[in-house]
């Protein structure tokens, strides 16, 4: 009897000692794994950059909203800035190294010299025919001219907004505009646009469909024309197609990587009265200086404030691709 009890006690002690040894071994192994894992994290953490997955995904509205809690690089370290200016600016400055001077001044505002591009255009009229905005941020300087203020307004409306466009065959079809965002945009060396509104029987309203001389003329020998007619009414068009191309376009919304700076002028260009402009604020501003050096100095001084009003976009504007999307 006593032998059985001794055996039971001995078995219990051996089991307890064995279990205690196994638990201690497991504890040492876990400590080794955890400490080694923490050591690896500490060593590698300075070499890794934080990634915030999903934060920058668009929810609704603009695709260009930058959220405060996302990992963001400094704008000027990863972006390009194009500055568009008229030929008269370079002519007045008359200095072969003026661009290098401005690049060095932009550097004082945090923009590396390789990120600034200077783009010259002849005048507003020629720029309207072939606008090309390729940089992450684009600032267009437009010298005010009372004789060209309507051209300036149309150009501003074109480049400050995105448009979805399709070609129009005016020889075969009638066209109508469905809503206020629907416009007909014409570009070319000389665009003369005539329209004839039609009734439900496709007869001209105040005009003869067989006589273009009776059509209403809405533009004469212009480079850029944004035509707006009565919505929901079919129109027969007459366009100088030999020197002009017309497209059926839909305004999608603001092109947020473009800003227009008006140089001088007693009147301030304003396209926010257009009901299709939403929101009712545009990246348009005015600088009142007589000399171009003073204009460029002001742009350099306020470049970062100007950029804050804009959003970096991936799409560029190229009139050659206007048929699809600009």
Swiss-Prot record:
Keywords, in A-Z order: Calcium, Capsid protein, Disulfide bond, Glycoprotein, Host endoplasmic reticulum, Host-virus interaction, Metal-binding, Outer capsid protein, Signal, T=13 icosahedral capsid protein, Virion
Keyword Signal: yes
Ranges for region CNP motif: 165-167
Signal peptide start-end: 1-50
Gene3D superfamilies: Glycoprotein VP7, domain 1, Rotavirus outer-layer protein VP7, domain 2
Disulfide cysteine pairs (residue numbers): 82-135, 165-249, 191-244, 196-207
Record note on modification: N-glycosylated.
Known glycosylation sites: 69
Annotated segments matching region LVD motif: 237-239
Cellular compartments per GO CC: host cell endoplasmic reticulum lumen; T=13 icosahedral viral capsid; viral outer capsid
Binding site for Ca(2+) 1: 95, 206, 214, 216
One Pfam family recorded for the sequence: VP7
Compartments, record wording: Virion; Host endoplasmic reticulum lumen
Gene Ontology molecular function terms on file: metal ion binding
Record InterPro entries: VP7, VP7_1, VP7_2
Residues given in the record as Ca(2+) 2 binding sites: 177, 228-229, 231, 301
Region (GPR motif): 253-255
Additional observations: Some rotavirus strains are neuraminidase-sensitive and require sialic acid to attach to the cell surface. Some rotavirus strains are integrin-dependent. Some rotavirus strains depend on ganglioside for their entry into the host cell. Hsp70 also seems to be involved in the entry of some strains.
HAMAP family: Rota_VP7 (MF_04130), Rota_VP7_A (MF_04131)
Protein family according to the UniProt entry: Belongs to the rotavirus VP7 family.
Subunit architecture: Homotrimer; disulfide-linked. 2 Ca(2+) ions bound at each subunit interface in the trimer hold the trimer together. Interacts with the intermediate capsid protein VP6. Interacts with the outer capsid protein VP5*.
Function according to Swiss-Prot or TrEMBL: Calcium-binding protein that interacts with rotavirus cell receptors once the initial attachment by VP4 has been achieved. Rotavirus attachment and entry into the host cell probably involves multiple sequential contacts between the outer capsid proteins VP4 and VP7, and the cell receptors. Following entry into the host cell, low intracellular or intravesicular Ca(2+) concentration probably causes the calcium-stabilized VP7 trimers to dissociate from the virion. This step is probably necessary for the membrane-disrupting entry step and the release of VP4, which is locked onto the virion by VP7.
Name of protein: Outer capsid glycoprotein VP7
Species assigned in the record: Rotavirus A (isolate RVA/Human/Belgium/B4106/2000/G3P11[14]) (RV-A)
Organism taxonomic ancestry: Viruses, Riboviria, Orthornavirae, Duplornaviricota, Resentoviricetes
């Amino acid at each position: 009897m006593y032998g059985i009890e001794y055996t039971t006690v001995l078995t219990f002690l051996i089991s307890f000692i064995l279990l205690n040894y196994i638990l201690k071994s497991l504890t040492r192994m876990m400590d080794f794994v955890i400490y080694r894992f923490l050591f690896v994290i500490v060593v590698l953490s300075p070499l890794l950059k934080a990634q915030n997955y999903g934060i920058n995904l668009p929810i609704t509205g603009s695709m260009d909203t930058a959220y405060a809690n996302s990992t963001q690089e400094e704008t000027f370290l990863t972006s390009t800035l194009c500055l568009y200016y008229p030929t008269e600016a370079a002519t007045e400055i008359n200095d072969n190294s003026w661009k290098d001077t401005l690049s060095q001044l932009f550097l004082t505002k945090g923009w590396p010299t390789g990120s600034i591009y200077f783009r010259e255009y002849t005048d507003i009229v020629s720029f309207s025919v072939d606008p090309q905005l390729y940089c992450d941020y684009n600032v267009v300087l437009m010298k005010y001219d009372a004789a060209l203020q309507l051209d300036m307004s149309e150009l501003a409306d074109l480049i400050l907004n995105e448009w979805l466009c399709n070609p129009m065959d005016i020889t075969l079809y009638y066209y109508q505009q469905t809503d206020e965002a629907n416009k007909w945009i014409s570009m070319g060396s000389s665009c003369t646009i005539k329209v004839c509104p039609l009734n439900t029987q496709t007869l001209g309203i105040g005009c003869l469909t067989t006589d273009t001389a009776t059509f209403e003329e809405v533009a004469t020998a212009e480079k850029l024309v944004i035509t707006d007619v009565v919505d929901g009414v079919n129109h027969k068009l007459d366009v100088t197609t030999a020197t002009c191309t017309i497209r059926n376009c839909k305004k999608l919304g603001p092109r947020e990587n473009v800003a227009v700076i008006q140089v001088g002028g007693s009147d301030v260009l304003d396209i926010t009265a257009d009901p299709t402009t939403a929101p009712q604020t545009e990246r348009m501003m005015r600088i009142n200086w007589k000399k171009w050096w003073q204009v460029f100095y002001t742009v350099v001084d306020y470049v970062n404030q100007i950029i804050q009003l804009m959003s970096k976009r991936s799409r560029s504007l190229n009139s050659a691709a206007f048929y699809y999307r600009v």
